Amino acid sequence: MALYFVYLSTLLALILLGDNWAAGTYASRYTQHVDENQSGAAAQSGSKVTSRHRNWCAYVVTRTVSCVMEDGVETYVKPEYQRCAWGQCSHVVLYRTYRKPRYKVAYKVVSEMEWKCCHGYSGDDCSDGSSAIHDSRARPTGEEGRSDSDRIRQLEEQIQSLNKNLHNLQKKIYEESQREGISGGNNLADAAQPGMKETIHSIQTKLDMLDNMTRVHDKTLTNINNHLVGGNGIENELDSRYGTLKEEILRELERRVTLSCSSCQTGVESIQRQHQEDRERIRELEKHISVMEQHHQQTLDLLSRSQSCCDSLDRKLSAIDRKVSSTAETYDILRGRLEKELRSNGNGGRGKAMEEKLNNRLRDLERRLNGTVRKTEQKCSHTETSMKEFVQREIGQIKNSVLGRNDDHGYRISTVEIDIQDLKRFINDHKNNLERLGNKTNDLDSGLKSAIHLCTETCAAKGSETEDTVKSLEWKVVANEEDIKKFDTKLKDISVSGDSLLDRVIDLSNDVQKIKDLTGQNGEHFNQIVTDVENLGRDCDVCSSIDGELQKIRNVTSYAFDKFQAELTVLGRKVFSDEHVCSQVCSNLQEEVGKLKEEVEKCTGQCMISMADHQRNVDNQNTVTRKLGKDLKSIQGELTGILQIFNSINDTLKGLRNTIQKHGNNITDLNTSKGKIYLELDQLYDDLNKHKVDSKGHFDSISSFNSNLMTEMGECRLSREGLDKRLSKMEDVCGRLDTLSENLKTIKDGLSKHVSGLWTCVNDLNSTVISHSETISRIHNVHLENIQGRMNNLNSSIRNVLKEFQIFTEQDFTGPPGLPGPQGEKGSKGPPGPRGPLGKEGPQGRVGPVGPPGLRGEQGPPGKDANVPRLSFSAALTRPQASSGTIIFNKVFINERKAYNPKTGVFTAPVRGRYFFSAVLTGHKNVKIEAVLSKSNFGIARGDSAGYQPEGLEKPMAEARHTPGSLVIFNIVLPLQEGDTICIDLVTGKLAHSVEPLTIFSGMLLYEESEDRL
C-alpha cells in the first residue's frame, strides 16, 4: 500500500502541474481580451490595466515536500517454542532471525505555479501601483482569440479526462485495499519488489524534466510580464512580439501537456502492471500456503501413526492389569481355603515353620529385585558419563583437525602469493633488459651519426684539391649517363626488394629477441620452461594419486558409518530382547507364585495359624504384589521410553548419514576441479595421511567403545536430558561442518582464480612459441637466389668505384716548395708541462700521541639460540580406575616427541637429562587412596591421602578415628637415562573420573646432560 501511495502522490503532482498550466492559459486569455475602449482610455489617461484579472502575473514557486522512502533492511530475533514430538520432553526454544524493511522521511523540492501581483503592484487585489504605467497592448483579432480558446478548451478536456482516470484508479485501488482487508490484510513486504525501484527512478527523472520545463516557462512568463507591465509606445512591434511569444507559449504548453498526459498514462499502466504482479504473487503465496498445509497434514498423520505404539502399550498394560486382577482373585480363593483348613486343623507348630519359610522366600525375592534395580542405575550412570566423554572428545578432535586444515590453507595461499611476486620480479628483470638493449641501439645510432658527420667534415676540408677530379668524374658521368640510369633503375628495384627484406629481417630479429628474452641468451630459461612443464605433469600425477586417496577415505568413512548404523540396529534388537527378558522375569515370578501356591496347598492340612498373624501376612503379600505390579509397569514404561529414544537416535543418525553423503558429493565435486588446485595438493597429501591415521585411531576407539556399549547396554536406562544434550552437540557439529564446507568453497573459488590466471599465462607462452615457429618456417621458405645475384653485382660495382677513388686519393697533388715568408710575431705563453717523476721516500716520522677513545660500535647481530630440546607431556584420567595397578591417563593434552604412551600410562625418557614430574590424584569423598611413583619398576616416592601411619606394633591401641583425605600430589625432579620409564601405580582406593579432569599427570625436560658432564 505504501507503494500505491507513492504512485498516487506522483500522479497528483503531475496533475497539479497541469492545472497550474491551465490556470496560466486562463490568465493569459483573460488578460489578452481587453476592450478597445478601456485600453484606449487607459492609454489616454495613463491609468492601470482594466481586466478581469488585472495586475496579476504567473510565477513559478518551489516548495519542500516530505515523503517516505525505503532505507535498507534491519534484522530482529524472535523466539519460537517447539513442542516435543512424543510429549515427554521439555519445550525447545529456537531463536530465528527475521528481516524487515527500514523507512526514512526524505524531503524533496517541488516547483508549482502561483498567481501573484505583477511588478510594481501590491495590495489584496493588486490594485495599488504606480499611475505612470501605461497599457500599450492591442486587442487581438477575433480569429486569434477563437484559435486560442479552442486550444485551451482541448487542453481542459484532456485534463478533465485525466482527472476522471485518476478518480477511477483511486476507486479501484480503494476497492482492492478493502478486499485485501476483508481477506486477511496484506502484510507489508520485507523488501522492495524488483520493479519498484526502477519505476520510482523513471518517475523521478520525469519530474526533474518537468521541473526544468517549468523553470523555462517561468522565465518566459517573467519576460511577458515585464513586457506587459513596462511597455513603451511602440505598439506594432510589441503586438508582433507578443503574438509570436503567445504562439510559442501555447505550442510549448500543448507539447508539455501531451508529455504530462503520456507520463500519467505510463504511470497508470505501470501501476496496473504492478497490481497484476502483486495478484500473481498473492496466488503463488496461496499455493505455497496450501503446500504447507498438506505438509502439516502429513506430519500430523505421521504423529498419529507414531502414537499407535502408545495404544499398543495401553493394551499391554490393560492385559497386565487383567492378569494382576486374576492373580488377586486366585489369591483370595486360596486365602479362603486356607482359612477353612486352619479352622478345621488345630496344629500350630508346622504353620509357624511354613510362615517363616514363606517370609524368607519373600525377603530373598525383595533383595534380588533391589539388587537388580541398583545395578541398572549404576550402569546407566556409567554409560551416560562415558557417552558424554566420548562425544566431547570427538568434537575436540574434529575442531582441532578443522583448525589445522585452515592454518594449512592459509600457509599455502601465502606460498602462492610469494610465487606470484617472484614471477612479477622476473618479468620486471626482462623489462629492464629490454630497456638496456634499447639504450645500446641508441648509442649505436649516435655513433653512426658522428661518423657520418666526421666524413662530411674531412671531405669539405679537401674540396679545393679535388675540383679537377670532380670535373673528370663529371665527364665520366656524362659519358656513362645511360649506364647510370639503367643502374639507377636496377638500384631502385633492389632497394624496394631490400626494404621488404629489411622489414622481414627486422621482424625476424624482434621475434628472435623475444625468444631470447623468454629462453635466455644461452637457453637457460628454456630449460626452466621445460622443467616447469615436467613439474606440471608430475603435479597432475600427484593430483590423480590424491584423487585415489580421497576416494579411499570416502569409502572408509562410509563403511565406518554403515558399520556404526548396523551396530545401533543390533543394540535396538537387544533392547527389544530386554523386553522379552522382562517378560521372562514376570513368568519366573508367576512360576514362583505357582510354587508358593503348591506349597501352600501341601501345607493346608498341616498348618494352623492364628487369624491375626495370617491377616498380617496376607496384607504384606498384597503390598508386595502391588509393588511388583507397579515396578513392572514402571519397567515397561521405561523400556518403551528407551525404544523411542533409540528410534530418535536412529533417525538422527540417518540424517547425519545423509549430510555425510552430501559432504561426500561435495568432495567429489571438488575432485572434478583437481586440475585447478594442483598447487595445494602436494601439501594436502601429507595432511590426508595424518588425518587417515587419526581417523583410524578414532574408528578403533569407536569400535572399542561400541564393544563396551554392547556389553553394558542390556539393562541400560538412558536419561532424557543426556539425549537432548547429545543431540544439541550433534547439531553444533553439523553446523560447524556446514561452515567448513563454506570455507572450502571460498578457498576453492580463490584457488580457481589463481590457477586460471596461471593457465592463461601458459596459453600465452604456447601461442607465442607457435607464432615464432611459424615465422621461422616462413623465413626458411623464402627464395633468395635472385636477390643474392643482384647483391653480388651491386657489391662488385661498389668495389670498382672504391678502387678508383682510392687511386685518386693516392695521387700526389703537392707542388714545388715556395719562398720563405716573413718572421711572425711572438706567440703567447704555452701551457705548463707534464709533471715530473716522484722523488725518493723520506725517513719514517716519530710516533704520535695516543688519540682519544673512539665512538661505541654498532650492536652486533643476535646470536643463535642454544640447542635445547623441547620435551613435555600432560595427560588426565577420564575413565574409571577401580582396581589397583598402573594408572592409565587416557586423555592427552600435549605429548611432544610421543614419549608418553596413553595406552599403558608409562613415560619413556628419549634423552638423558634432568626431568620434572607432577601429579595430582583425586579420589572419592572420605575414601583413602595410596599411590607410588615408580622409576623403571622401582618405587621412588609414595603418597597417602590419610597421612603417615606407623606400622605394626608402633601403632597406638586407642586413637581417634579421623576422616581420611582423598588427594595425593607428587612434585619431583629426577635424573633419567635414555630408556628409563616413569609411571604411577595405585595401591589402594578408587580414583574419581569426570569429563572435567580431576586426576592429572604431567612432566617436562629441564635440560639435557652429556656423558662427560656426569
Swiss-Prot record:
One of its GO terms (cellular component) is extracellular region. PROSITE patterns: C1Q, EMI. Residues 815-865 form the Collagen-like domain. Residues 53-128 form the EMI domain. Keywords: Coiled coil, Disulfide bond, Extracellular matrix, Secreted, Signal. It is found in: Secreted, Extracellular space, Extracellular matrix. Residues 866-1012 form the C1q domain. Residues 134-150 have a biased composition (Basic and acidic residues). Disulfide bonds join 57-118, 84-89, 117-126. Residues 840-856 have a biased composition (Low complexity). GO terms for biological process: axon arborization; hemopoiesis. Residues 1-27 form the signal peptide. Residues 125-150, 811-869 are annotated as: Disordered. Disruption phenotype: Morphants at 48 hpf display body curvature defects, impaired brain development, and motor neuron defects with abnormal development of axons and decreased arborization. Morphant embryos and larvae have decreased locomotor activity compared to wild-type. Residues 145-179 form a coiled coil. May be responsible for anchoring smooth muscle cells to elastic fibers, and may be involved not only in the formation of the elastic fiber, but also in the processes that regulate vessel assembly. Has cell adhesive capacity. This is EMILIN-1-A. It comes from Danio rerio.
